[in-house]
From Swiss-Prot:
This is Putative triphosphatase YjbK. Residues 4-189 form the CYTH domain. It comes from Bacillus subtilis (strain 168). Gene3D superfamilies: Hypothetical Protein Pfu-838710-001. The gene is yjbK. Its EC number is 3.6.1.-. One of its GO terms (molecular function) is hydrolase activity. Keywords: Hydrolase. InterPro entries: CYTH-like_dom_sf (IPR033469), CYTH_domain (IPR023577), Uncharacterised_YjbK (IPR009195). Pfam families: CYTH.
Amino acid sequence: MSQEIEIEFKNMLTKQEFKNIASALQLTEKDFTDQKNHYFDTDSFALKQKHAALRIRRKNGKYVLTLKEPADVGLLETHQQLSEVSDLAGFSVPEGPVKDQLHKLQIDTDAIQYFGSLATNRAEKETEKGLIVLDHSRYLNKEDYEIEFEAADWHEGRQAFEKLLQQFSIPQRETKNKILRFYEEKRKSI
């Protein structure tokens, strides 16, 4: 089973802050790649209620089904490779580690349905302390900018992330994860 603990820190950015960081990190357009997240839950938001999220990510022509759920530190991610997914509306969770983990969470996998998609243009830059990720996301007629910092250790990562924000004079902003931002925007459109 492909599982990992994800420790990441996030902060929303203005478009100008995003451009400033990209420039300082010497990131050009060719460093950014497109990926698309397709989100799923039950009509009663059973996953959201458990602070979990289910997505299929299409990146570089490959599809990965990922379940994210809370862990003692960070998030536990369970991954499963998929062959091409052509019918998102009719998608059902295949046998494998993700379905097994959903059952452990007591989620009815037959009730899972497609909620929508979020497209992200992403660049990554490895540093001594962790991975800097710049995301420009588009979903439901909205766009936003975000910086993420992934680290192996929570305390060292937090310290490095705060230093990074200070370096660019960026205030810490409450930042929800992409799926929550997507759901909030979707709720506005209903």
